[in-house]
Protein backbone atom coordinates (compact mmCIF):
# COMPACT_ATOMS: atom_id res chain seq x y z
CA UNK A 1 0.00 0.00 0.00
CA UNK A 2 2.83 2.38 0.91
CA UNK A 3 4.49 1.76 -2.45
CA UNK A 4 1.23 2.46 -4.29
CA UNK A 5 0.71 5.72 -2.34
CA UNK A 6 4.27 6.79 -3.11
CA UNK A 7 3.76 6.07 -6.79
CA UNK A 8 0.49 8.01 -6.79
CA UNK A 9 2.19 11.01 -5.15
CA UNK A 10 5.02 10.85 -7.69
CA UNK A 11 2.59 10.75 -10.58
CA UNK A 12 0.66 13.68 -9.14
CA UNK A 13 3.87 15.71 -8.86
CA UNK A 14 4.79 14.82 -12.42
CA UNK A 15 1.35 15.85 -13.60
CA UNK A 16 1.63 19.22 -11.92
CA UNK A 17 5.09 19.70 -13.43
CA UNK A 18 3.74 18.84 -16.88
CA UNK A 19 0.86 21.27 -16.54
CA UNK A 20 3.20 24.03 -15.35
CA UNK A 21 5.50 23.42 -18.32
CA UNK A 22 2.49 23.50 -20.61
CA UNK A 23 1.32 26.82 -19.16
CA UNK A 24 4.82 28.24 -19.67
CA UNK A 25 4.89 27.23 -23.32
CA UNK A 26 6.66 23.91 -22.80
CA UNK A 27 5.38 20.45 -23.48
CA UNK A 28 1.60 20.14 -23.64
CA UNK A 29 -0.41 17.26 -22.30
CA UNK A 30 -2.53 14.99 -24.41
CA UNK A 31 -6.18 15.25 -25.18
CA UNK A 32 -7.48 12.34 -23.15
CA UNK A 33 -10.51 10.36 -24.10
CA UNK A 34 -13.35 10.07 -21.65
CA UNK A 35 -14.63 7.26 -19.53
CA UNK A 36 -13.80 4.29 -21.71
CA UNK A 37 -12.75 3.11 -25.14
CA UNK A 38 -15.75 1.52 -26.75
CA UNK A 39 -15.45 -1.97 -28.14
CA UNK A 40 -15.76 -1.54 -31.89
CA UNK A 41 -15.31 -3.67 -34.95
CA UNK A 42 -13.48 -2.75 -38.11
CA UNK A 43 -15.51 -0.96 -40.72
CA UNK A 44 -16.67 2.45 -41.85
CA UNK A 45 -16.65 5.22 -39.30
CA UNK A 46 -18.94 7.44 -41.33
CA UNK A 47 -21.78 7.08 -38.84
CA UNK A 48 -19.65 8.09 -35.86
CA UNK A 49 -19.57 11.82 -36.57
CA UNK A 50 -23.07 12.26 -35.17
CA UNK A 51 -21.73 11.32 -31.73
CA UNK A 52 -19.79 14.58 -31.52
CA UNK A 53 -22.70 16.72 -30.38
CA UNK A 54 -22.69 17.80 -26.77
CA UNK A 55 -19.00 17.03 -26.18
CA UNK A 56 -16.80 19.56 -24.43
CA UNK A 57 -14.49 21.67 -26.56
CA UNK A 58 -10.86 20.57 -26.46
CA UNK A 59 -7.97 23.00 -25.99
CA UNK A 60 -5.49 22.35 -28.82
CA UNK A 61 -2.60 23.17 -26.50
CA UNK A 62 -3.46 20.04 -24.56
CA UNK A 63 -2.14 17.77 -27.32
CA UNK A 64 1.50 16.70 -26.97
CA UNK A 65 3.78 17.88 -29.71
CA UNK A 66 1.27 20.39 -31.04
CA UNK A 67 1.54 24.13 -31.38
CA UNK A 68 -0.77 25.96 -29.04
CA UNK A 69 -1.78 28.24 -31.87
CA UNK A 70 -2.59 25.33 -34.19
CA UNK A 71 -3.57 26.23 -37.74
CA UNK A 72 -4.51 29.68 -38.95
CA UNK A 73 -8.22 28.85 -38.95
CA UNK A 74 -10.42 28.11 -35.97
CA UNK A 75 -10.69 24.36 -35.33
CA UNK A 76 -13.54 22.64 -37.12
CA UNK A 77 -16.23 20.87 -35.14
CA UNK A 78 -15.79 17.10 -35.12
CA UNK A 79 -19.33 16.50 -36.33
CA UNK A 80 -18.75 18.85 -39.27
CA UNK A 81 -15.75 16.96 -40.63
CA UNK A 82 -16.53 15.68 -44.13
CA UNK A 83 -15.56 12.14 -45.00
CA UNK A 84 -13.69 11.74 -48.28
CA UNK A 85 -13.01 8.00 -48.34
CA UNK A 86 -11.65 4.98 -46.49
CA UNK A 87 -8.45 2.96 -46.54
CA UNK A 88 -8.92 0.01 -48.87
CA UNK A 89 -7.46 -2.79 -46.78
CA UNK A 90 -6.56 -6.10 -48.42
CA UNK A 91 -6.17 -8.58 -45.55
CA UNK A 92 -6.27 -6.59 -42.30
CA UNK A 93 -9.48 -6.93 -40.28
CA UNK A 94 -8.57 -5.44 -36.90
CA UNK A 95 -8.31 -1.79 -37.92
CA UNK A 96 -10.08 0.61 -40.25
CA UNK A 97 -9.33 4.15 -41.41
CA UNK A 98 -11.72 6.81 -42.68
CA UNK A 99 -10.32 9.95 -44.30
CA UNK A 100 -11.76 13.44 -43.82
CA UNK A 101 -11.21 16.82 -45.43
CA UNK A 102 -8.30 18.87 -44.14
CA UNK A 103 -6.00 15.87 -43.68
CA UNK A 104 -7.91 14.40 -40.74
CA UNK A 105 -8.38 10.64 -40.33
CA UNK A 106 -10.45 8.53 -37.96
CA UNK A 107 -8.77 5.27 -36.97
CA UNK A 108 -10.88 2.46 -35.52
CA UNK A 109 -9.04 -0.40 -33.80
CA UNK A 110 -11.14 -3.43 -33.00
CA UNK A 111 -11.95 -3.64 -29.28
CA UNK A 112 -9.56 -0.75 -28.54
CA UNK A 113 -11.47 2.37 -29.54
CA UNK A 114 -11.25 5.26 -31.99
CA UNK A 115 -8.47 7.74 -32.65
CA UNK A 116 -8.71 11.06 -34.44
CA UNK A 117 -5.47 11.71 -36.30
CA UNK A 118 -4.93 15.40 -36.96
CA UNK A 119 -2.32 17.11 -39.19
CA UNK A 120 0.82 18.43 -37.49
CA UNK A 121 -0.10 22.10 -37.76
CA UNK A 122 -3.86 21.81 -37.28
CA UNK A 123 -5.84 22.67 -34.18
CA UNK A 124 -7.90 20.03 -32.43
CA UNK A 125 -11.54 20.18 -33.56
CA UNK A 126 -14.16 21.06 -31.01
CA UNK A 127 -16.79 18.53 -30.01
CA UNK A 128 -14.54 15.47 -30.07
CA UNK A 129 -16.50 12.61 -28.40
CA UNK A 130 -15.26 11.28 -25.08
CA UNK A 131 -14.45 7.87 -26.57
CA UNK A 132 -12.15 9.31 -29.25
CA UNK A 133 -8.45 9.81 -28.48
CA UNK A 134 -6.72 12.62 -30.36
CA UNK A 135 -3.36 11.83 -31.96
CA UNK A 136 -1.15 14.22 -33.88
CA UNK A 137 0.37 12.99 -37.11
CA UNK A 138 4.13 12.36 -37.23
CA UNK A 139 4.67 12.02 -33.45
CA UNK A 140 8.14 12.44 -31.99
CA UNK A 141 9.69 10.58 -29.05
CA UNK A 142 7.41 7.55 -29.27
CA UNK A 143 7.26 5.17 -26.30
CA UNK A 144 6.98 1.77 -27.98
CA UNK A 145 5.92 -1.08 -25.70
CA UNK A 146 4.68 -3.36 -28.52
CA UNK A 147 7.88 -5.08 -29.65
CA UNK A 148 6.32 -6.56 -32.80
CA UNK A 149 5.50 -3.02 -34.01
CA UNK A 150 9.15 -1.92 -33.98
CA UNK A 151 9.79 -3.53 -37.35
CA UNK A 152 7.18 -1.30 -38.98
CA UNK A 153 9.20 1.73 -37.86
CA UNK A 154 12.42 0.09 -39.06
CA UNK A 155 11.02 -0.72 -42.50
CA UNK A 156 9.75 2.85 -42.88
CA UNK A 157 13.11 4.34 -41.88
CA UNK A 158 11.45 5.87 -38.83
CA UNK A 159 13.36 4.38 -35.90
CA UNK A 160 14.42 7.92 -35.01
CA UNK A 161 10.81 8.52 -33.97
CA UNK A 162 11.11 5.87 -31.23
CA UNK A 163 12.77 7.21 -28.09
CA UNK A 164 11.76 4.63 -25.46
CA UNK A 165 11.19 0.87 -25.54
CA UNK A 166 9.99 -1.65 -22.96
CA UNK A 167 12.25 -4.40 -24.35
CA UNK A 168 15.85 -4.75 -23.18
CA UNK A 169 18.74 -4.59 -25.64
CA UNK A 170 19.62 -8.27 -25.18
CA UNK A 171 16.08 -9.27 -26.14
CA UNK A 172 16.18 -7.54 -29.53
CA UNK A 173 17.16 -9.40 -32.70
CA UNK A 174 16.85 -6.34 -34.97
CA UNK A 175 20.42 -4.99 -35.44
CA UNK A 176 19.24 -1.42 -36.04
CA UNK A 177 17.39 -1.40 -32.72
CA UNK A 178 20.37 -2.87 -30.87
CA UNK A 179 22.58 -0.17 -32.37
CA UNK A 180 20.12 2.55 -31.35
CA UNK A 181 20.07 1.28 -27.77
CA UNK A 182 23.86 1.07 -27.66
CA UNK A 183 24.27 4.60 -28.98
CA UNK A 184 21.65 6.09 -26.67
CA UNK A 185 19.37 7.13 -29.53
CA UNK A 186 16.82 4.79 -27.97
CA UNK A 187 16.41 4.06 -24.26
CA UNK A 188 15.01 1.17 -22.24
CA UNK A 189 12.41 2.51 -19.83
CA UNK A 190 11.36 -0.59 -17.92
CA UNK A 191 8.89 -3.41 -18.41
CA UNK A 192 5.61 -2.50 -20.11
CA UNK A 193 3.72 -2.96 -16.84
CA UNK A 194 6.13 -0.84 -14.77
CA UNK A 195 7.57 1.85 -17.05
CA UNK A 196 9.57 4.79 -15.76
CA UNK A 197 6.85 7.47 -15.84
CA UNK A 198 9.29 10.23 -14.94
CA UNK A 199 11.53 9.30 -17.86
CA UNK A 200 8.54 9.15 -20.22
CA UNK A 201 7.65 12.72 -19.25
CA UNK A 202 11.21 14.01 -19.32
CA UNK A 203 11.67 12.59 -22.82
CA UNK A 204 8.46 14.38 -23.88
CA UNK A 205 6.88 11.26 -25.33
CA UNK A 206 3.90 12.13 -27.49
CA UNK A 207 2.31 8.68 -27.74
CA UNK A 208 2.56 5.26 -26.09
CA UNK A 209 2.07 2.26 -28.36
CA UNK A 210 1.22 -0.86 -26.37
CA UNK A 211 0.52 -4.49 -27.19
CA UNK A 212 -2.60 -6.17 -25.84
CA UNK A 213 -0.49 -7.28 -22.87
CA UNK A 214 -1.32 -3.87 -21.40
CA UNK A 215 -4.77 -5.24 -20.57
CA UNK A 216 -3.06 -7.38 -17.92
CA UNK A 217 -1.88 -4.13 -16.34
CA UNK A 218 -4.79 -1.70 -16.87
CA UNK A 219 -3.56 0.74 -14.21
CA UNK A 220 -0.42 1.34 -16.27
CA UNK A 221 -2.53 2.45 -19.22
CA UNK A 222 -4.64 4.63 -16.93
CA UNK A 223 -1.55 6.28 -15.44
CA UNK A 224 -0.08 7.02 -18.86
CA UNK A 225 -3.33 8.68 -19.89
CA UNK A 226 -3.49 10.50 -16.57
CA UNK A 227 -0.09 11.98 -17.39
CA UNK A 228 -1.36 13.17 -20.76
CA UNK A 229 0.16 10.41 -22.90
CA UNK A 230 -2.33 9.04 -25.46
CA UNK A 231 -2.21 5.24 -25.66
CA UNK A 232 -2.73 3.24 -28.86
CA UNK A 233 -3.04 -0.53 -28.45
CA UNK A 234 -1.66 -2.57 -31.35
CA UNK A 235 -3.80 -5.63 -32.21
CA UNK A 236 -1.81 -6.78 -35.24
CA UNK A 237 -1.13 -10.15 -33.61
CA UNK A 238 -4.88 -10.83 -33.65
CA UNK A 239 -5.12 -10.66 -37.42
CA UNK A 240 -6.33 -14.02 -38.79
CA UNK A 241 -4.14 -13.76 -41.92
CA UNK A 242 -0.35 -13.23 -41.74
CA UNK A 243 -0.57 -10.64 -44.52
CA UNK A 244 -3.19 -8.83 -42.43
CA UNK A 245 -0.67 -8.65 -39.60
CA UNK A 246 1.90 -7.15 -41.94
CA UNK A 247 -0.67 -4.71 -43.37
CA UNK A 248 -0.53 -2.76 -40.11
CA UNK A 249 2.51 -1.06 -41.64
CA UNK A 250 -0.03 1.02 -43.58
CA UNK A 251 -1.59 2.23 -40.32
CA UNK A 252 1.83 3.19 -38.98
CA UNK A 253 2.64 4.87 -42.28
CA UNK A 254 -0.49 6.99 -41.85
CA UNK A 255 0.50 7.84 -38.27
CA UNK A 256 4.05 8.78 -39.28
CA UNK A 257 3.08 10.80 -42.33
CA UNK A 258 4.54 8.36 -44.89
CA UNK A 259 1.42 6.50 -45.96
CA UNK A 260 2.40 6.26 -49.64
CA UNK A 261 5.77 4.75 -48.72
CA UNK A 262 4.08 2.21 -46.44
CA UNK A 263 1.54 1.25 -49.12
CA UNK A 264 4.30 0.80 -51.71
CA UNK A 265 6.22 -1.44 -49.32
CA UNK A 266 3.13 -3.50 -48.54
CA UNK A 267 2.16 -3.83 -52.21
CA UNK A 268 5.60 -5.25 -53.03
CA UNK A 269 5.34 -7.78 -50.22
CA UNK A 270 1.79 -8.74 -51.20
CA UNK A 271 2.99 -9.28 -54.80
CA UNK A 272 5.73 -11.61 -53.54
CA UNK A 273 3.13 -13.54 -51.55
CA UNK A 274 0.85 -13.78 -54.61
CA UNK A 275 3.77 -15.11 -56.62
CA UNK A 276 4.32 -17.90 -54.10
CA UNK A 277 0.63 -18.76 -53.94
CA UNK A 278 0.30 -18.89 -57.73
CA UNK A 279 3.17 -21.38 -57.92
CA UNK A 280 1.48 -23.93 -55.67
CA UNK A 281 0.44 -27.08 -57.50
CA UNK A 282 0.30 -29.63 -54.69
CA UNK A 283 -2.88 -31.50 -53.97
CA UNK A 284 -3.97 -32.15 -50.40
CA UNK A 285 -2.55 -35.67 -50.68
CA UNK A 286 0.89 -34.49 -51.83
CA UNK A 287 1.42 -31.68 -49.32
CA UNK A 288 4.41 -32.14 -47.05
CA UNK A 289 3.69 -32.15 -43.33
CA UNK A 290 5.60 -29.83 -41.00
CA UNK A 291 6.26 -29.84 -37.25
CA UNK A 292 7.28 -26.46 -35.81
CA UNK A 293 8.47 -26.67 -32.19
CA UNK A 294 11.13 -26.36 -29.54
CA UNK A 295 12.02 -28.47 -26.50
CA UNK A 296 11.53 -26.71 -23.17
CA UNK A 297 13.99 -26.84 -20.29
CA UNK A 298 11.49 -29.08 -18.53
CA UNK A 299 11.68 -31.67 -21.29
CA UNK A 300 8.32 -30.95 -22.94
CA UNK A 301 7.60 -29.82 -26.48
CA UNK A 302 6.22 -26.38 -27.25
CA UNK A 303 4.24 -26.23 -30.49
CA UNK A 304 2.20 -23.63 -32.34
CA UNK A 305 -1.57 -23.73 -32.09
CA UNK A 306 -3.63 -24.04 -35.27
CA UNK A 307 -4.61 -20.59 -36.50
CA UNK A 308 -1.41 -19.02 -35.14
CA UNK A 309 0.39 -16.96 -37.75
CA UNK A 310 3.31 -19.43 -37.92
CA UNK A 311 1.06 -22.43 -38.56
CA UNK A 312 -0.91 -20.31 -41.05
CA UNK A 313 2.30 -19.39 -42.90
CA UNK A 314 3.18 -23.08 -43.20
CA UNK A 315 -0.20 -23.75 -44.78
CA UNK A 316 0.02 -20.71 -47.07
CA UNK A 317 3.47 -21.88 -48.20
CA UNK A 318 1.90 -25.13 -49.38
CA UNK A 319 2.53 -27.31 -46.34
CA UNK A 320 0.34 -29.14 -43.86
CA UNK A 321 0.80 -28.22 -40.22
CA UNK A 322 1.09 -31.52 -38.36
CA UNK A 323 -0.60 -30.30 -35.17
CA UNK A 324 -3.66 -28.77 -36.81
CA UNK A 325 -5.83 -31.02 -34.64
CA UNK A 326 -4.91 -29.22 -31.41
CA UNK A 327 -7.64 -27.17 -29.77
CA UNK A 328 -7.54 -23.41 -29.57
CA UNK A 329 -7.53 -20.51 -31.99
CA UNK A 330 -4.12 -18.97 -32.53
CA UNK A 331 -5.67 -15.60 -33.31
CA UNK A 332 -7.40 -15.24 -29.95
CA UNK A 333 -5.82 -17.68 -27.49
CA UNK A 334 -2.22 -18.36 -26.57
CA UNK A 335 -0.22 -18.82 -29.76
CA UNK A 336 1.59 -21.88 -28.40
CA UNK A 337 0.83 -25.01 -26.45
CA UNK A 338 3.14 -27.19 -24.38
CA UNK A 339 2.65 -30.95 -24.67
CA UNK A 340 4.56 -33.92 -23.29
CA UNK A 341 7.19 -35.51 -25.51
CA UNK A 342 5.25 -38.73 -25.98
CA UNK A 343 2.29 -36.80 -27.37
CA UNK A 344 4.63 -34.74 -29.53
CA UNK A 345 6.37 -37.85 -30.85
CA UNK A 346 3.07 -39.48 -31.74
CA UNK A 347 2.14 -36.45 -33.85
CA UNK A 348 5.53 -35.54 -35.29
CA UNK A 349 7.25 -38.88 -35.93
CA UNK A 350 5.90 -39.05 -39.49
CA UNK A 351 6.25 -35.35 -40.30
CA UNK A 352 8.14 -34.77 -43.54
CA UNK A 353 9.88 -31.67 -42.21
CA UNK A 354 10.82 -30.46 -38.74
CA UNK A 355 11.47 -26.79 -38.01
CA UNK A 356 13.05 -26.03 -34.65
CA UNK A 357 12.31 -22.63 -33.14
CA UNK A 358 15.42 -20.95 -31.72
CA UNK A 359 13.71 -17.99 -30.03
CA UNK A 360 13.58 -19.57 -26.55
CA UNK A 361 16.02 -22.44 -26.27
CA UNK A 362 18.60 -21.18 -28.74
CA UNK A 363 19.58 -22.33 -32.21
CA UNK A 364 20.70 -25.83 -33.16
CA UNK A 365 23.05 -26.63 -36.04
CA UNK A 366 23.37 -30.42 -35.86
CA UNK A 367 20.88 -33.25 -35.39
CA UNK A 368 22.97 -34.47 -32.45
CA UNK A 369 21.92 -31.34 -30.57
CA UNK A 370 18.26 -32.12 -31.21
CA UNK A 371 18.61 -35.76 -30.20
CA UNK A 372 20.44 -34.68 -27.04
CA UNK A 373 17.33 -32.73 -26.07
CA UNK A 374 15.30 -35.93 -26.51
CA UNK A 375 16.54 -39.31 -27.72
CA UNK A 376 12.93 -40.07 -28.64
CA UNK A 377 13.32 -37.86 -31.71
CA UNK A 378 16.14 -39.91 -33.26
CA UNK A 379 13.86 -42.09 -35.38
CA UNK A 380 11.49 -39.34 -36.51
CA UNK A 381 11.08 -39.37 -40.29
CA UNK A 382 12.46 -35.84 -40.77
CA UNK A 383 15.54 -36.59 -38.64
CA UNK A 384 16.26 -39.84 -40.47
CA UNK A 385 15.83 -38.18 -43.87
CA UNK A 386 17.88 -35.12 -42.92
CA UNK A 387 15.03 -32.65 -43.36
CA UNK A 388 15.39 -30.69 -40.12
CA UNK A 389 15.62 -26.89 -40.19
CA UNK A 390 16.04 -24.20 -37.57
CA UNK A 391 14.07 -20.94 -37.52
CA UNK A 392 16.14 -17.88 -36.73
CA UNK A 393 15.24 -15.92 -33.60
CA UNK A 394 14.53 -12.81 -35.66
CA UNK A 395 11.54 -14.54 -37.23
CA UNK A 396 9.25 -13.19 -34.51
CA UNK A 397 10.42 -9.57 -34.48
CA UNK A 398 10.71 -9.08 -38.25
CA UNK A 399 7.01 -8.48 -38.71
CA UNK A 400 7.48 -7.02 -42.17
CA UNK A 401 9.26 -10.15 -43.42
CA UNK A 402 6.10 -12.27 -43.56
CA UNK A 403 6.04 -12.69 -47.35
CA UNK A 404 9.74 -13.60 -47.40
CA UNK A 405 9.16 -16.12 -44.61
CA UNK A 406 6.37 -17.77 -46.60
CA UNK A 407 8.58 -17.82 -49.70
CA UNK A 408 11.44 -19.48 -47.81
CA UNK A 409 9.06 -22.02 -46.27
CA UNK A 410 7.83 -22.82 -49.77
CA UNK A 411 11.41 -23.34 -50.97
CA UNK A 412 12.03 -25.73 -48.07
CA UNK A 413 8.80 -27.61 -48.78
CA UNK A 414 9.58 -27.98 -52.48
CA UNK A 415 13.21 -28.97 -51.95
CA UNK A 416 14.49 -25.86 -53.73
CA UNK A 417 16.00 -24.11 -50.72
CA UNK A 418 19.60 -22.96 -50.92
CA UNK A 419 20.59 -23.19 -47.26
CA UNK A 420 23.24 -20.50 -47.69
CA UNK A 421 20.86 -17.88 -49.07
CA UNK A 422 17.95 -18.20 -46.65
CA UNK A 423 17.28 -15.28 -44.34
CA UNK A 424 15.04 -16.80 -41.68
CA UNK A 425 16.01 -20.50 -41.62
CA UNK A 426 19.12 -22.65 -41.72
CA UNK A 427 19.64 -26.35 -42.34
CA UNK A 428 20.35 -28.61 -39.37
CA UNK A 429 23.05 -31.05 -40.54
Language-model-detected regions and their locations in the chain:
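C-terminal motif of bacterial Sec signal peptides marking the signal peptidase cleavage site
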Residues: 19-23
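A short, structured surface patch at a secondary-structure boundary
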Residues: 105-201, 207-214
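Bacterial N-terminal signal peptides that target proteins for export
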Residues: 1-13
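Flexible, glycine-rich surface segments
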Residues: 276-365
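Bacterial Sec-exported substrate-binding components of ABC uptake systems
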Residues: 24-150, 261-292, 417-429
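Structured C-terminal subdomain patch of bacterial secreted/periplasmic proteins
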Residues: 239-267, 277, 353-429
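Structural recognition of the beta-strand scaffold that forms the well-ordered cores
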Residues: 141-144, 161-165, 207-211, 231-234, ...
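Extracytoplasmic ligand-binding site segments that recognize negatively charged/polar headgroups
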Residues: 140, 147-155, 165-176, 216-219, ...
Amino acid sequence: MKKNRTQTVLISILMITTLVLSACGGQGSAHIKGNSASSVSSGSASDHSSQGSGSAETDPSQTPGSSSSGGSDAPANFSALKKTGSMDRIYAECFAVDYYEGGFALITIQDEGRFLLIPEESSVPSGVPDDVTVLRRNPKNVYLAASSAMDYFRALGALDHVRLTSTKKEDWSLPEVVNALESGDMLYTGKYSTPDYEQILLEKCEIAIESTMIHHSPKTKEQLELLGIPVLVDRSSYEPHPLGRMEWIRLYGLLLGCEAQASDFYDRQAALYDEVRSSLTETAESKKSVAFFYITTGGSANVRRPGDYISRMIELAGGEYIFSYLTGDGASASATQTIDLETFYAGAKDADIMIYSSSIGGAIDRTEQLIKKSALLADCKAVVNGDVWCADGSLYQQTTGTADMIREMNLILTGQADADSLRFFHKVN
